[in-house]
Structures are given as C-alpha cells and as structure tokens.
C-alpha cells in the first residue's frame, strides 16, 4: 500500500520500525499514524480513503429519469408535433450541444419554459430524450429513418454512429442506393463511403434494382464514373445506362451524352461498340454521343496512337481483376514455319486459337509493350525477316504498320525496358549478330545502341533491376554460357557471371527477382536442366530439371507461375507445357497447345477487358462510317 500515513518515505525495515516504536508515547501516536520519527515535531496528517462509485452515475440517471417521468423539478417542456415532453435543461444541455446552445445563450428559448422543436419526428425525439436519461436506445428498421435525422439535428454523435452502424448491416443490392442517398442528405460521411463501396462492389446486382432505375442523373454519374466499379466488362455499364435511360426516355434523353461520357467506350469490344452502341437509335440521334463512339473507334483502330489518347475513358476500372494470359506465337512445326497464334488462360487451362500473323515466323522474338504484342523478325521458311507485326487483343487483329528493324533477324532476343522494345543479336542469314537496336513506339523508329561484346544467335534476354541481360546463345561456332548486361544509362554492356551450362535456344524469364534459364541445347544434345541467376550475389545456382528436354522452348511467368512452353526434345516437336513450383522445386505437366512449336515466341498480357474477346471476324473498318 506504499508508505504509512505520516512517514517520510525515507525509512524501511526493522530500523525504521524501531524508531517508530520508540517515539510513539511522546508523540501521542494513536496507532494510525507515525510522528516524530526524525526528532522534529510535525502536525499529524489525517487518514484518507479514496473511493469512486461505479453505481452513482447509473443511480443518479435512474433517479433523474424518475423525476422526469413524474414531472418533478422539470424546468422545460418540449413541444414536438402534438406531444409534450417534460425534461430538465441541465440534462439536455449536458447531452446535446444543440440544447446547450439553446439554453445557455441569448436565444429566446433560454427564457422560455416551453420550447417548440420543428422538423423532427415526435417518436424519434422521445427516444432521444429517453437516451439522455437512460443511456439506452433501440435502433430498428421502423425508426432509423426518423432517428438519424433527429440525432443529427440534436448533435447526438453517438446515436448518429449507432444508426449508421445499423444501416451498414442492412445494406443489400436492393436498398444500398437509398441508404447512400439518405447518408448523403444527412452528411453521414462514413455511411456514405460504405454505401458507395457496397454499390461499386455489387454493381452487377444493383443495376437490376428498381432503386437504380429511379436514380437522379447526378447520382447515376457519381456511380458510373468510379474507377472502383466492379464489372466483368464495360458492356455492363453501357447496358445499365441504357436501362436507366429507357425507364423514362422523354425526360432523360437530354442527359444521354452527359451520362455516356462516363462509360468507357474505348474499352468495349469492337463488335459491341459497332453492333450495339453505334447502332442504338438514341445514340445515333445525338451528335455528342456519336462523337464519343467515334473517339472509341479511333482508339481501337489506331493502337500506335494510344499513348497520346489516354484519359479517363481509356483507363480500365480497378476491380476488373483481369488475370494474365499467355500467347504462343509462330514457330516451327511439321517441317515448316507457321503463322498460327494461340492463347492460354491458366484459369480455365484452355488453349484457344486467335488471329494468325500475316507471315509465317520461326525464331521470332516476342514481347509486350503498351498492352500490345509484338512479333519481331524470324524466318518464314525461305527468307530471313526484318518485318514486325503487332497484335491487339481487344480487336483480335494483327497490324503491319510497325517500322522494320535495320537488320533481318531470326533467333533474336526481344525485351522491353523503359518503354522501348529491344532487339538483341540473332542471325541475318550471313552472320551471327551482336547488333542491338531499340524501338520507340511514339516515333515508330528503330535506333541502334551499343553492340554486345559477343555475337549471339539463339540468345535469351531478360530485364531485371533496370538492366537488359543477354544470356547464352551461340556465337556461330558453339553454344555459350556467358552472360552480359546492358545499362541504358551508360549505353554499355558488361559481363556478369556465366551460367554453369552452355545453352543456345534456351528459355529465359524473370521470376521472384531471379533470372531463370531453362533447356536449350549444348554441344551435344537438347537439355532439360535449369538454373537461376541472383543479381545480388552475381551467382547462378541449379534448380530441378524439367520433365522433358526442350530446345527452342518458350519461358514466361503467368499469374505468378513459371511456364515452359513447347520446344524440341531431340526426336519430336513438343506441344506440352509444364509449370514450375519454386516452393517444392518441382516441374509438372499441365496440358498441351493446339500446335507443336519449336522456336516460337511467348508473351504475357492481361486478359482482354471484354468478355466476348473472341469476337467475330467482321472488321471494324467496314463499319467505321459516322452514323447518319
């Protein structure tokens, strides 16, 4: 319990106890205190016991409430609707800033014994006054719509919070818009935020509700302009807008352009844009709407111009949560180069054919830049190529309007660094190359950069930490295990640690901050072995071998998993793929492509924005005339 009453706090133990005992009689000690222990007389201190009652507030409130109910000592009567509510000014002022300002200021009500309160429900006021006296209230569906505005008026923050919590728990797709409007009206910011989030997340159900059809135009715009709107495709947003419009065409058609500008038309599939949006009579009859449709068509038709056309309508909505898909491009199959391209979706484990390239390409370099897939160079079975094609997954079309490389290249390495597309090494039919050039999509031009220190065909390239790595390949005489990296800031190539194995026509990818090198061919045979490079330690270390030998293999990371695609095992072209698990250090087979592919390229992209990605072959250009 600490020092005894009257002690100095400087003595303890037997000595201190003896001093106290020896001076007790001369000091007149009663036994409840110690005096004179230091030889100096001091006035005795009174005994103390501190106590705080936990019952007192509750008992006091209970008694005050009893006085109120018996109308005793009440000094104010509230006239609310047709009801008189007796109360005590001091209690109301202590609980409510509204009443405190009313009764302690210079307002006329401060001198009145009866005060009329307008614009408040009498039952809600009764509940709130009860709460002031009892600290208890029940919020339910039948009273929350009158209780919340009353609590806002009286500035009873605790009740506002309880009402908002109740409404949060009641949110569903049929009432969330009403709750949102209610929260907005009464400036309940947290409830408004929660209702907005709920509406955005459940938009696909909300758009089917009657509340949605009854929305005023301003609230509709607030909802559909959000980046957080959770939709499978922008088609759902357009359909929702048109349902809202057609609920009352006479009054709402004047708002169509105002609303349609918040639908991200450039993200629609061409088929839907032309066949549904562009052909809608209400859209066609409005000049501003036609302009929006034309803008979307231009965005789809001119992929090279997209960097200059970015804006709110071209920005994908965040919750779309599109997964990644893998494209296998060209290659060698059944004794000839092929132009076929197919797409792998890990979520369905399906390979689907997409539009083929205009040229057959084996030894093609493939990379993704600005959501477009580039196929660089290769060999068509007769000639070495310097031409390039670019694939747009939104339109399922290849375009050939990309500037060619300065040299013909097959078995070329291609990668993207700092917004530029790099073409590294390869062969031109005369010699093995150490040339490196890069493509600027804004200028549609290639420019040469510093050459590698070694000529390399069948080279693999990777980008990590702001550097471009050239890995293995062949110098035209024998396979290489050497590795060099390019620093674009210094325009210089520098050697780093070599692989443990010589590899040409290997697969390469960056995975979990390592560079993985798999398969390929050494001096004697096709390889199944694999290794990875740690840039922090500048070392290579082996990982488990693939299930098959694979030369001319594609390697890519899709949705956080490492896939090895196709290749040649020494006796047959492969269409199998396998996936690597770094935790178990194991490869497992996981399906087959439609085509066997040796020396094909692979690229990874986000799944197309629209669900009907595999749209029909009708060309957008055939429908690009402005509506009359």
Curated annotation (Swiss-Prot):
Alphabetized InterPro entries for the sequence: BACK, BTB-kelch_protein, BTB/POZ_dom, Gal_Oxase/kelch_b-propeller, Kelch-typ_b-propeller, Kelch_1, SKP1/BTB/POZ_sf
Gene Ontology MF annotations: actin binding
Recorded metabolic or biological pathway in which this protein acts: Protein modification; protein ubiquitination
Region (Disordered): 1-56
UniProt feature coiled coil, ranges: none
GO-annotated biological processes: negative regulation of synaptic assembly at neuromuscular junction; protein ubiquitination
Pfam families, per database record: BACK, BTB, Kelch_1
SMART domains: BACK (SM00875), BTB (SM00225), Kelch (SM00612)
Extent of the Kelch repeats: 325-371, 373-419, 420-466, 468-513, 515-560, 561-607
Keyword presence, Repeat: yes
Swiss-Prot/TrEMBL keywords: Actin-binding, Kelch repeat, Repeat, Ubl conjugation pathway
Boundaries of every BACK domain copy: 176-278
Superkingdom classification of source: Eukaryota
Biased composition (Low complexity): 14-29
Sequence ranges assigned to domain BTB in this UniProt record: 74-141
Function: Probable substrate-specific adapter of an E3 ubiquitin-protein ligase complex which mediates the ubiquitination and subsequent proteasomal degradation of target proteins. May have a role in synapse differentiation and growth.
The protein, known as: Kelch-like protein diablo
Gene: dbo
């Amino acid at each position: 319990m600490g020092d005894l009453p009257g002690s100095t706090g400087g003595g303890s133990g037997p000595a201190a106890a003896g001093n106290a005992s020896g001076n007790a009689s001369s000091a007149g000690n009663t036994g409840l205190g110690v005096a004179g222990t230091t030889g100096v007389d001091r006035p005795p201190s009174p005994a103390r016991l501190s106590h705080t009652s936990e019952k007192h507030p509750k008992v006091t409130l209970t008694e005050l409430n009893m006085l109120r109910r018996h109308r005793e000592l009440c000094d104010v009567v509230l006239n609310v609707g047709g009801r008189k509510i007796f109360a005590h000014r001091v209690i109301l002022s202590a609980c409510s800033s509204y009443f405190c300002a009313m009764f302690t200021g210079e307002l006329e009500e401060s001198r009145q014994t009866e005060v009329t309160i307008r614009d408040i429900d009498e039952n809600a006021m009764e509940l709130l006054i009860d709460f002031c006296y009892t600290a208890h209230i029940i919020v339910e569906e039948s009273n929350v719509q009158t209780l919340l505005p009353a609590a806002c008026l009286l500035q009873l923050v605790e009740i506002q919070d309880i009402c908002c919590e109740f409404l949060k728990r009641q949110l569903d797709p049929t009432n969330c818009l009403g709750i949102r409007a209610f929260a907005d009206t009464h400036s309940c910011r947290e409830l408004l935020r929660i209702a907005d989030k709920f509406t955005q997340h459940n938009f696909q159900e909300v758009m089917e509700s009657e509340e949605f059809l009854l929305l005023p135009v301003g609230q509709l715009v607030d909802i559909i302009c959000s980046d957080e709107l959770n939709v499978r495709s922008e088609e759902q947003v357009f359909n929702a807008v048109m349902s809202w419009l057609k609920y009352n065409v006479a009054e709402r058609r004047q708002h169509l352009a105002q609303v349609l500008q918040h639908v991200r038309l450039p993200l629609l599939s061409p088929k839907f844009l032309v066949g549904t949006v562009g052909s809608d009579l209400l859209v066609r009859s409005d000049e501003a709407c036609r302009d929006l449709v034309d803008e979307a068509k231009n965005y789809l038709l001119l992929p090279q111009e997209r960097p200059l056309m970015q804006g709110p309508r071209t920005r994908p909505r965040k919750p779309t949560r599109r997964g990644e898909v893998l494209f296998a491009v060209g290659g060698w199959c059944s004794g000839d180069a092929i132009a076929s391209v197919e797409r792998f979706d890990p979520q369905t484990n399906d390979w689907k054919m997409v539009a083929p390239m205009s040229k057959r390409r084996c030894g093609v370099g493939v990379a993704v830049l600005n959501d477009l897939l580039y196929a660089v160079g290769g060999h068509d079975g007769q000639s070495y190529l310097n031409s390039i094609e670019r694939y747009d997954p939104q339109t399922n079309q290849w375009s050939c309007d990309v500037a060619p490389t300065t040299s013909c290249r097959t078995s070329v390495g291609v990668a993207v660094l700092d917004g530029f597309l790099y073409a590294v090494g390869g062969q031109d039919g005369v010699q093995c190359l150490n040339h490196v050039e890069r493509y600027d999509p804004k200028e549609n031009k290639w420019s040469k950069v510093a050459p590698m220190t070694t000529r390399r065909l069948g080279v693999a390239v990777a980008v990590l930490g702001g550097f471009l790595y050239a890995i293995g390949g062949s110098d035209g005489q024998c396979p290489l295990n050497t590795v060099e990296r390019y620093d674009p800031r210094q325009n210089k190539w520098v050697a780093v640690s070599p692989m443990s194995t010589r590899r040409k026509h290997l697969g390469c990818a960056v995975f979990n901050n390592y560079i993985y090198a798999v398969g390929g061919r050494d001096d004697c045979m096709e390889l199944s072995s694999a290794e990875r490079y740690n840039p922090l330690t500048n070392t290579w270390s082996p990982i488990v071998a693939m299930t098959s030998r694979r030369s001319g293999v594609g390697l890519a990371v899709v949705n956080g998993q490492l896939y090895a695609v196709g290749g040649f095992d020494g006796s047959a072209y492969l269409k199998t793929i396998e996936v690597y698990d770094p935790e178990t250090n194991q490869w497992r087979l996981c399906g087959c492509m439609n085509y066997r592919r040796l020396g094909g390229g692979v690229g990874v992209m986000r799944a197309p924005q629209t669900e009907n990605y595999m749209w029909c072959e009708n060309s957008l250009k055939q429908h690009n005339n402005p509506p009359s």
